[in-house]
From Swiss-Prot:
Catalyzes the condensation reaction of fatty acid synthesis by the addition to an acyl acceptor of two carbons from malonyl-ACP. Catalyzes the first condensation reaction which initiates fatty acid synthesis and may therefore play a role in governing the total rate of fatty acid production. Possesses both acetoacetyl-ACP synthase and acetyl transacylase activities. Its substrate specificity determines the biosynthesis of branched-chain and/or straight-chain of fatty acids. InterPro entries: ACP_syn_III_C, ACP_syn_III_N, FabH, Thiolase-like. It comes from the Bacteria. This is Beta-ketoacyl-[acyl-carrier-protein] synthase III. Residues 261-265 are annotated as: ACP-binding. The gene is fabH. It comes from Sulfurovum sp. (strain NBC37-1). The last Arg residue of the ACP-binding site is essential for the weak association between ACP/AcpP and FabH. Its main location: cytoplasm.
């Protein structure tokens, strides 16, 4: 009796895009009651990129995706699933941003849909892509994390406007028969009892579009900062310890720990709890801020373009976001290294 050969999901390429406009801490000093010193001390953020008025989530996602496709060495016709993680879609509920990105890339008659898992979105997509590929249903999955967070930020609220930036990252996840190229583990979870920690109240079924929404600023992101900080450190640390223990991998053996880039103090606290060396921890929050679902792929792209990420290198991804959601992944980089 013939035996079906196992199929594994592999991380084949990465791409990213950031808008050209930079909003510095000095700029924010002129807009709200804050200082560069305070922002850097509390968050580690020095600047963030902001999309133009006529530049949308789908535009940024399509540009990142185009790079990922080119770097994977495949054609757009080879893609059989398009997934987008975003909480700042082009449209409130339909069409999906994944469908719009597919159209902008010229990808036709291919399944496409969005997921909403806030900052955990990209790693959530890895779980979906893995399931589709290892079931044999798909061979090349385009995953995108893209956000125009400036569209839901109140630039008179100093507690949130200092944190967020815009951008996009994308990857090609492909089928392979080589176990050493395949994902080692991915994990995602959620707890809706903390839903009010991070929320954009409107528009939605609870707060439909109305004058009240505009007057009360319900269309802007709201955040319980202190509570979110404490829970993020606790949850991220626990999640990483569990995935490492499950797979019998020591934290010191991870060359690239890529956490969600929300806040330097969160990243440092988690890194310290895991006894990670500074050279293991990837940091991009200083120049991009929190780009939500785009954060992790943008960070991966940063170390790939610099030549730091090599073929076969192990990546540990860890993220936490509104929902509340959290996710982690252990996987090798199966793409080509940058040639220098």
């Amino acid at each position: 009796m013939s035996q079906t050969k196992p199929v594994y999901a592999s991380f084949r390429s990465i791409g990213a895009y950031v808008p050209s406009k930079i909003l510095s801490n000095a700029d924010l000093e002129k807009m709200v009651d804050t200082t560069d010193e305070w922002i850097v001390k509390r968050t580690g953020i020095k600047e963030r990129h902001i999309a133009a008025d006529d530049e949308y989530t789908s535009d940024m996602g399509a540009k990142a995706a185009k790079l990922a496709i080119e770097r994977a060495g495949i054609e757009k016709e080879d893609i059989d699933l398009v997934l987008c993680a975003t909480v700042t879609p082009d449209y409130f509920n339909m069409p999906s941003t994944a469908c719009i990105i597919s159209d902008k890339l010229g990808i036709r008659n291919v399944q496409a849909f969005d997921i909403s898992a806030a900052c955990s979105g990209f790693v959530y997509l890895l779980t979906v892509a893995k399931a589709f590929i290892e079931s044999g249903m798909k061979k090349n999955v385009l995953i995108i994390g893209a956000e125009k967070f400036s569209s839901v930020v109140d630039y008179t609220d100093r507690s949130t406007c200092i944190l967020f930036g815009d951008g996009a990252g994308a990857a090609i996840i492909s089928a392979t028969d080589k176990k050493e190229e395949g994902f080692i583990d991915v994990h995602a979870s959620a707890d809706g009892s903390y839903a009010d920690f991070l929320v954009t109240p409107a528009p939605g079924a609870i707060n439909p579009a109305s004058q009240k929404v505009i007057d009360e600023g319900l269309n802007f992101v709201q955040m319980k900062g202190n509570e979110t900080f404490k829970l993020a450190v606790k949850t991220l640390t626990k999640d990483v310890k569990e995935i490492l223990a499950k797979n019998k991998i020591d934290s010191g053996d991870i060359p690239h720990f890529i956490p969600h880039q929300a806040n330097y103090r969160i990243i440092k606290a988690v890194g310290d709890a895991l006894k990670m060396r500074e050279d293991q921890v990837v940091l991009t929050v200083g120049k991009y801020g929190n780009t939500s679902a785009a954060s992790i792929p943008m960070a991966i792209n940063e170390i790939w373009e610099s030549g730091r990420l090599k073929t076969g290198d192990l990546m540990l991804l860890d993220t936490f976001g509104g929902g509340l959601t959290w996710a982690s992944a252990l996987l090798p980089f199966a793409g080509e290294s940058v040639q220098r």
